[in-house]
Amino acid sequence: LLLAGGAVILLAGMVVVGTWVVKEIESGVINRAGLMTSLYVDSFVSLHLQSLASNGQLREVDRAALDRLLSGTSLGQHIVAFKIWTADGRVLYSTNPAIVGRQFSVKPTLASAFAGEVHSEISDLKEPENEFERQRWPRLLETYAPVRAANTGAILAVSEFYQTTDDLEREVRAAR
């Protein structure tokens, strides 16, 4: 009886530790993927957002460049949805033109990006600004990253981009 009780406790401990390890692996993969992709995205996108430093507006030539960048390139194949946000929650640019100009509540993840942090998580596609994404995907990896002015380093806007969770799920399975 004592041996059976010990086995139950050991088994329960293994389940708890196993679950914790999987969550830690998933968290690490999410953070690493978000950070690496944010650097990659920033290297292509920030050039087209520098006009925000002078007038707070996105020029039409820059909108067109973002459209080209996100549709026919390797970056566009990797990113399934993309948004540029202002600090007050207004969408300056989106791969879903229907939400451009609309204002949404500022979530903590958006606020932390305006404070200079890169933040990645599995997206809550129930949010109002995710209507387009919710219709096409069951789960997405969402990353918020600050976009800085080239000459001052001031944060001009925040880019938000979505990736499918296929790579994430593959890495977590491999780690198990």
Segments (PLM) and residue ranges:
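Conserved long hydrophobic alpha-helices within structured protein cores
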Residues: A33-V45, D88, S112-D124
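Membrane-proximal extracytoplasmic alpha-helices
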Residues: W20-S51, V61, A65, L69, ...
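Extreme N-terminal signal-anchor transmembrane helix of membrane signaling/transducer proteins, especially
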Residues: L1-V21
